[in-house]
Amino acid sequence: MEGNCTAETTCHVTAVVRVPKYCNCFALCYEIPILWDDVLHRHEKLLFGGFTCNAGIELIVTKHCCLAEAQTWRVHCHCSNSLSLQCMASKHVVQKVIEDFIKGGAMNKKYMWYREFVNSSRPDEINYVGSIIFRNTHYIYFRLSFFRTVHKACMEAIKRCINPELGVVLKSTYNYWLVLKCKSCSLQNYCSLKNCAVWVRSVIVRVLKEVEKTPVVLHQTTSKAEERRQSALRQAMMHGRCRQIQNLCLVNLNAFLHF
């Protein structure tokens, strides 16, 4: 159903959305992937599903991309005619869904401890980025980054651990992602989020054990780069201190160069 924005596909920008700063944890990766099969209603998938892509929305990078400010993001469409009525109708439907979807990212500011807990003593190769809670489902995003020589083996190992009910592994424009799904979380329920964080760490432990069966060495420590990202996000979200997104960005060249 979903495509990727590459040179081989028909891809055009249909809308631009302004996203609050609580989603700027995703801005470090230049994109927010969206699981359209989950997010769109059945009739919306029938009408517009073929025009969506894993990339979801993509950050519009400017000279002044500051973590402490709301950012603008572009929405893609993959139909064959950007001037068709179907494309224009799709634009309004998809834009409304995205605007509702990103509201669920408020937890990234409200519960900043979640990222710090999940990423504690974990390798950068499987890095928790942020969360979206939408229609009673908590989407938990991990960026995947392995050396090219072991990338394929590691991705296959991760897929063996993840069934469709638990989550999905996908390739987007700038990164590879693992998106876990939790059905018991609530933005207002602190205890459920604590339980979710513990569950997520247990899932990642299983994933890491499977990945380590491949010829790869993972350092079970919080990287200095992740500590800098956490510090920058906390200063930006809580104190309004501006940090340039480009200086902290995370882009996986394996995905970006389509390896």
From Swiss-Prot:
Its main location: host cell. This is Early E4 30 kDa protein. Plays a major role to prevent cellular inhibition of viral genome replication by nuclear bodies. Assembles an SCF-like E3 ubiquitin ligase complex based on the cellular proteins ELOB, ELOC, CUL5 and RBX1, in cooperation with viral E1B-55K. This viral RING-type ligase ubiquitinates cellular substrates prior to proteasomal degradation: p53/TP53, LIG4, MRE11-RAD50-NBS1 (MRN) complex, ITGA3, DAXX and BLM. Disulfide bonds: none annotated. It holds the Pfam family Adeno_E4_34. Interacts with E1B-55k. Keywords: Early protein, Host cytoplasm, Host nucleus. It comes from Canine adenovirus serotype 2 (strain Toronto A 26-61) (CAdV-2). One of its GO terms (cellular component) is host cell nucleus. Belongs to the adenoviridae E4 30 to 34 kDa protein family. InterPro entries: Adenovirus_E4_30/34. It is found in: Host nucleus; Host cytoplasm. It comes from the Viruses.
